[in-house]
Amino acid sequence: MSKTGGNDSKSTLYCSFCGKSQHEVRKLIAGPTVFICDECVELCMDIIREESKSSLVKSRDGVPTPKEIRRVLDDYVIGQDFAKKVLSVAVHNHYKRLAHATKHNDVELAKSNIMLIGPTGSGKTLLAQTLARILDVPFTMADATTLTEAGYVGEDVENIILKLLQASDYNVERAQRGIVYIDEIDKISRKSDNPSITRDVSGEGVQQALLKIMEGTVASVPPQGGRKHPQQEFLQVDTTNILFICGGAFAGLERIISQRGKGTSIGFGATVQAPDDRRTGEIFRSVEPEDLLKFGLIPEFVGRLPVLATLEDLDEAALKKILQEPKNALVKQYQRLFEMENVDLTFQDEALSLVARKAIERKTGARGLRSILETILLDTMYDLPGLESVEQVVIGPEVVEGKSRPLYIHGDRNKDAPASVSA
């Protein structure tokens, strides 16, 4: 423990690691003979996280084991146990296949791209992002709704590979082992089962264009991005070992799955079908490739995505956990934001339950949680920088319902004055 000279030496305490005084930091934790401040604790935690990320348990192939991949996914994504297991095995096998690509030439292992099917806000995008973080490979996201056939206004499918190249700093070797996540894949389904005079340039046409790069081809990628620079030299990227993960909400697919096998009949002798009262996520667990064909995906495209992982609807308990438990949980993010104003932010348990219920009512899943919290905390974040001596803000259920303002707890940090409360 360090001390100042003179009369202050008995009263002022210092961090034994960085030397800051108790007045310069929020918290000072005492040990037997030393002190450590909250900033040094955070720094130590960051170092431990980085080291744990690099010390993943790996199999003999140098690839993280499925259980280890699952464990790290659990740190960031709540629930979705079935999808995590499917993804962990598929990704492990994919990179194990790459590790043995040159060792055995008698049997060629085919690539297994992945299809994620789940309601909005169930964690599809977050799962793909976390996988790339675990494996330390280039990762890019693409929106299927912006893609069109070559020659039409919109993005070419080759632009997806360009984004992957940019994510790998134009290192072609690294890009060829990366992960591509294509979101909103359900939006490029065929518009109709019947052939039309007009071309479906953003539906079936895009599916046809994606086939080759997903299966494996040498794509000619313009480094400056497409059609505006026709004279530029092209980079050659082999997509054979790029893992493609496609995700979509597939609204209406649950009806196709429920109707499968029931048959149809009309007339007085027709059997009345009981409505399927299962939740959407439960119905998705029964999905078959034939259901995706009826939805509007072409057979060749479905065949390029042999691994199907379905995600479930998030209930109130899961949404509450999402608010609090992941490493980058929303409550932790807002608490950190308030810490910058030297204020503790506290949510009562019933308040978090109400936030979760609101997200369920809006049918936005986890994606809607941030919007709800922003609305609740807007006035507080507006007023707080101009208020003095506020030490704590408490959010109760009445605040979430809009019936009252947050509770402000005032106090003087420099004196032994009693705290005061205001609403």
From Swiss-Prot:
Ligand binding (ATP): P119, T120, G121, S122, G123, K124, T125, L126
InterPro entries associated with the record: AAA+_ATPase, ATP-dep_Clp_protease_ClpX, ATPase_AAA_core, Clp_ATPase_C, Clp_protease_ATP-bd_su_ClpX, ClpX_bact, P-loop_NTPase, Znf_CppX_C4
Keywords: ATP-binding, Chaperone, Metal-binding, Nucleotide-binding, Zinc
Any one Gene Ontology BP term: cell division
Keyword ATP-binding part of the UniProt annotation: yes
UniProt-annotated binding residues for Zn(2+): C15, C18, C37, C40
Domain ClpX-type ZB: residue ranges: 3-56
Molecular function terms, GO-annotated: ATP binding; ATP hydrolysis activity; ATP-dependent protein folding chaperone; protein dimerization activity; unfolded protein binding; zinc ion binding
GO cellular component, one term: HslUV protease complex
The UniProt record lists the keyword Kinase: no
Self-association and partners: Component of the ClpX-ClpP complex. Forms a hexameric ring that, in the presence of ATP, binds to fourteen ClpP subunits assembled into a disk-like structure with a central cavity, resembling the structure of eukaryotic proteasomes.
Stated role: ATP-dependent specificity component of the Clp protease. It directs the protease to specific substrates. Can perform chaperone functions in the absence of ClpP.
PANTHER family: ATP-DEPENDENT CLP PROTEASE ATP-BINDING SUBUNIT CLPX-LIKE, MITOCHONDRIAL (PTHR48102:SF7), ATP-DEPENDENT CLP PROTEASE ATP-BINDING SUBUNIT CLPX-LIKE, MITOCHONDRIAL-RELATED (PTHR48102)
Family under the similarity heading: Belongs to the ClpX chaperone family.
Name of the molecule in the record: ATP-dependent Clp protease ATP-binding subunit ClpX
